[in-house]
């Protein structure tokens, strides 16, 4: 352990989920935008935007990290744990978001949208819809962990409540963290095993 706490946000069903005024304004802006959101299977298109848009802004999203993300997406899809939300305007693809559904928890994984869509409030709308669906199903919505203050504020704008876990202590890690480590280890063991059999 390195002694650092990591904060993540989640919303529990039945606890009076509330968003703030900024979220309300962004949802109204989105409603006027003409952008439509729906479920989809546009994995490659979303990953392409992550590569071109996010990798410029996030130093840790190097080629190795992007390949790991792609492998994780494949593993989640094969296990029918992946949910994808996409955004389009006049049939033009604007981006999408990946979520993990496991038991009674929906976990935000990663998203990427073109800049004009983000300015129209698409991310607020996508997250709001997913949170609302989670609450209706009596599921926990988990935003995941981030050390980035603006990400934490965005999650809190949408009603996320801070939770703390100790970063490298397995027993106190949030459920999504344990699951991703398990899937990653399982996926790579299978890959190595199949390569050795060739």
Question: Residue locations for each model-derived region?
Answer:
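A conserved beta-strand-loop-helix scaffold within acyl/acetyltransferase catalytic domains
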Residues: 1-118
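Aromatic (often tryptophan-rich) hydrophobic motifs at membrane interfaces
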Residues: 70-74, 78-178
